[in-house]
C-alpha cells in the first residue's frame, strides 16, 4: 500500500491545491510514483480525465505535476454548483444526480464507499498519495458523514498536515482554534502544520511557531513564502477572479463578463499570461468597456440563468453596441449557447425557465439534452487552419444556418459557428486559447506581433519552480520521511 499524507486547511483558499501540486512535482522529480487525490471538490472548473469522465481542474493540474495520467478516481466526488443552494453531483466521473445542500448531507454516507474505493485504486501501484482536503475540518456542523476532511482521513487512516494562510491574517488563531474545536480522535490525526503565503523575513515568525506549538503541541513542517510561480498556474475557482489584476494599460483589451455560474474560466489563463493583453474581468454593476476589442463569453453551468443575469446587468445592450462598433465576440460552451437566437430546456434539465431568447448574434438555436458530452478532443480551426487541442463538457445540441460555417472541425465533426462576417465565433471546445498556434493567430488578427510563449511549458516550469521552493522551505526531516 502506498504511503499517504493529507493536506487540510484552516479555511478555503489557503493554498492547499498549489502545495499538493508542488509536492507531487517534487516527489516525481525524485523518481517516485506519486498520485494526487481529493475526495470531494466543489468547482465548475472541470477537466476530462484521461480515462474519461469529469474531475476537478485542480486534480488534473496535480496529475500533470505528478507526471501521471489523470483519472476520475483522483476526484471521486465533484460538486458543480448550479444555483445558490443546489449542485450537480459527479461520482467517479459520471453524473450521479442533482442535490440541494441539506439533501446532500444525507447522501454523503452513501458516497463514502465510492471515495474509499477510488482511493484504493489511486494508491494501487503508487509509492505516495498526496490528498487534498476541502474547506476546513473545523466546520464541525458538517462533521457527521464527512467525506472531504477528517471523515475520510480517519476511515482511510491517512495522517493530516494542517495548512494555515498567514497572508490573510489571524493564522495563529486559525491553527489554535482548529486544535481547540476538533474532538480528540480528529485532533490525533494531525501530524503537524505548514504556514503558507508568508511575505518578508521568515525568521520574524519564530515566536509564532513557538506559540502555536505551546498551544497545540504540533510541530511546524515549514514556513512557505508567497510563491510567484503559483500565479502562472491555471486558476482553480471563482474566488481567484475577485483578486485578479485587470491587466496592462495600452495592451489589447479583452473583456470577460463574470456571471454567477461561470465555468471553466481557466480557458482564459493563456491569454492572461500574455504581456500585451489586458484581460478585464467585468463584475456585477460594471459596464462592458467600450474600448474592448474582443469580448469573450466563457462557459456557464446554467446557461439560461446566467443569460438572465447577463440581461439584468444591461450587458446585452453593451454587447450589441460593441458589435456595432466593429468589435468581435467569442462564446465558449455556455457562452456559445447564449449567442444564439433561442435556448430551450423543455426537459427542465437546468431546473428553471424552459425557453429563453438568446443574444441573437449567431443564427443558431440550442436545445438542452439529457446526454452529456464529456471527452478530450483534437481539432482544427477553420478560421486560421491551425491545430487545436481541448476538451468538451456540455449539455445541449446547437444547430442553425451559422453552423454551416463551423469554427472548428473537432474529432472529424464540424463544431461551433461563425457569423457571416466572421466577427462572432461560437464553439463547444474548451482549451482553444491554450493551443499556441491558435492564440498566436488570434492575437495577430488584432495587430499584435511577437513570439508567443509555449503555454504548457510555462505551466511545467512553474511547477518545477514551486517544487524547488518547497524543497527549500519545508522541514528536510519531514520531507525525508514523506519522500523516503
UniProtKB/Swiss-Prot annotation:
GO terms for molecular function: ABC-type vitamin B12 transporter activity; catalytic activity. The keyword Isomerase does not apply. It holds the Pfam family GATase_3. The keyword Signal does not apply. Pathway: Cofactor biosynthesis; adenosylcobalamin biosynthesis. GO terms for biological process: cobalamin biosynthetic process. Catalyzes amidations at positions B, D, E, and G on adenosylcobyrinic A,C-diamide. NH(2) groups are provided by glutamine, and one molecule of ATP is hydrogenolyzed for each amidation. This is Cobyric acid synthase. It comes from Rhizobium leguminosarum bv. trifolii (strain WSM2304).
